[in-house]
């Protein structure tokens, strides 16, 4: 089966990017090197093509009413022009996907529209789960992205750069805010969607636009010395920022409480949602494992599947691990037995048959200081 390609694939080739298969897409893992790309985002700005991600449109009269049962988070906690990070759960409280829902307000035919930005590896599962569990006579669900491009402009300079490109201020838009509008000088007939969101721990924007407009933004960014970045730097940046990767840190066997995402579960809202009974029980009785951060001595990297030990006892398993260019140390996430999941608890990590000292930390290793 041929790999899917982004509309900006030719830009990868021009840049001699190193390409890999990611969730059925041929995507750049790096352009100029992971460390350089990572540091560019931390110090100034980087540009990512994230067109592999899925974008689902849900339209209807009050569509939040119909999709609320798919989510443990109160969908009326955000309104038009805002986004909400949440999780979609199965009937046992396991995480089908983590995603962002955006409220676009009233669009065509006086119908309200929601956009769901979902993980590439989960798009088909998400789409079918939504269709199978909703009354499709009341709402419509479509692939919103089609041949559009999804870009992420990330870093402390990203807002200034984007304002220069659109020739307009975005200072009034809050974090997780979004807009869907036409910029006449860029494309007089095309609405561009953008949001103040990202996966790096920095200020950033995620932008959905046509191929022509995307090439315009790409070329503009490169002319301003913005570093094109691949999925490798995206992974190290999100790990430093304490953000989950679906399929590694969360899956259908992990619950929001175990993953440190209990704040997304609004039991007090009293709405019915898939997995509610299971999560009520976890809330009452507690959990057996918990996702934590790990700082590891030396330069050995704890990868997915490495055991975490306390003495001779196996107390957990690493889900994600990398060298942190910012912290200059090996870092990881791991699910640890809750009795041992204490901040500053010293543990050992088994890496290729050798034991390395580690310390349990908060999951976020980096926080921006501006």
UniProtKB/Swiss-Prot annotation:
Q: Transcription regulation among the record's keywords?
A: no
Under the heading Pfam families, the entry gives: GCV_T, GCV_T_C
Residues folding into a coiled coil are: none
Disulphide bridges: none
Citing just one GO molecular function, the answer is: transaminase activity
Q: Which SUPFAM superfamilies match?
A: Aminomethyltransferase beta-barrel domain, Folate-binding domain
Name the record gives this protein = Aminomethyltransferase
Q: Which organism is it from?
A: Prochlorococcus marinus (strain MIT 9215)
Its gene is: gcvT
């Amino acid at each position: 089966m041929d790999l899917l390609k982004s509309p900006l694939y030719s830009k990868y080739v021009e840049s001699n990017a190193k390409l890999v298969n990611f969730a059925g897409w041929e995507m750049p893992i790096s352009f100029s090197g992971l460390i350089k790309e990572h540091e560019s985002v931390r110090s100034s700005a980087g540009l990512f093509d994230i067109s592999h991600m899925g974008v689902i449109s849900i339209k209807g009269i009050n569509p939040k009413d119909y999709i609320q049962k798919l989510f443990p988070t109160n969908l009326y906690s955000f309104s038009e022009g805002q986004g909400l990070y949440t999780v979609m759960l199965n009937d046992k409280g396991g995480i089908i996907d983590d995603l962002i829902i955006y409220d676009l307000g009233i669009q065509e035919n006086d119908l309200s529209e929601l956009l769901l930005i979902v993980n590439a590896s989960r798009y088909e599962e998400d789409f079918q789960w939504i269709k199978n569990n909703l009354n499709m006579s009341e709402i419509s669900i479509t692939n919103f992205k089609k041949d559009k491009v999804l870009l992420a402009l990330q870093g402390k300079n990203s807002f200034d750069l984007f304002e220069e490109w659109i020739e307009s201020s975005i200072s009034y838009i809050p974090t997780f805010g979004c807009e869907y509008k036409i910029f006449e000088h860029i494309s007089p007939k095309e609405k561009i969607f953008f949001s103040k969101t990202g996966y790096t721990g920095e200020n950033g924007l995620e932008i959905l636009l046509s191929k022509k407009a995307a090439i315009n933004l790409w070329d503009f960014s490169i002319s301003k010395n913005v570093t094109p970045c691949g999925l490798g730097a995206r992974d190290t940046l999100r790990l430093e920022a304490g953000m989950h990767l679906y399929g590694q840190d969360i899956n259908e066997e992990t619950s929001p409480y175990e993953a440190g995402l209990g704040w997304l579960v609004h039991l007090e809202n009293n709405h019915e949602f898939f997995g509610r009974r299971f999560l009520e029980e976890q809330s009452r009785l507690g959990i057996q494992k918990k996702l934590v951060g790990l700082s590891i001595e030396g330069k050995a990297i704890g990868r997915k599947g490495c055991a975490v030990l306390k003495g001779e006892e196996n107390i957990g398993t690493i889900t994600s691990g990398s060298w942190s260019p910012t912290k200059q140390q090996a870092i990881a996430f791991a699910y640890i037995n809750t009795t041992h999941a204490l901040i500053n608890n010293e543990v050992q990590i088994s890496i290729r048959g050798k034991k390395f000292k580690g310390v349990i930390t908060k999951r976020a290793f980096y926080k921006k200081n501006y």
